[in-house]
Design a protein with these regions (language model features):
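Glycan-recognition and catalytic cores of secretory/periplasmic carbohydrate-active enzymes
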Residues: 1-167
Length: 167
């Protein structure tokens, strides 16, 4: 059973969060240095090393989005460059992909966070990048909206499997 400590404050977690972000930065760099992307996107680990499933690329947004969040939390400009450059170079195939349900994982983790950081003034605002990120999110949203399924009580967005599936 989980015990909720209602007296806990964010400041109480400072040292743990510092350690978390230190480890996160190490992992982002390690995956970049050691993982062979020609094998596909890393999905899970075997003996502590990432490997792929071969049939899905649903984690690619996390790969680069984690680097963007690393910058967001720590100011690590190297992580930002890695996340932004790879979003621009490698993530376009996910934007309009109708055969997956992973638009949030892939597109919000990358384009969405980069756009948010621009709006917050955390990274330089560049018009072409802003428009690029916005277009990616609009197209991704349109793909999701095309899955809208009407039911008597309203509706829902079905998965890539079809109206019978919320997966």
């Amino acid at each position: 059973m989980i015990k909720v400590n209602t007296s806990l404050k964010p400041a109480d977690l400072q040292s743990k969060l510092e350690r978390f972000w230190q480890l996160s930065g190490e992992k982002v760099r390690l995956i970049d240095a050691e993982y062979d992307l020609s094998k596909g996107t890393p999905v899970f680990t075997i003996d502590g090393k990432y490997t792929t499933r071969g049939w899905t690329e649903w984690t690619e947004g996390f790969l680069y989005g984690s680097a963007v969040l690393q910058f967001d939390a720590t100011g690590d400009k190297e992580a930002l460059a890695y996340g932004r450059d790879n979003t621009i170079r490698r993530m376009a195939s996910h934007v309009s992909h109708i055969g997956v349900h992973d638009h949030g994982f892939n597109n919000l983790s990358t384009y969405g966070n980069l756009l948010r950081l621009q709006h917050e003034g955390r990274i330089e605002k560049d018009d072409w990048q802003s428009h690029f990120y916005e277009l990616a999110l609009k197209v991704s949203g349109a793909v999701q909206a095309s899955r809208w399924t009407v039911i008597p009580e309203g509706g829902y967005i079905h998965s890539f499997n079809g109206p019978h599936s919320l997966f």
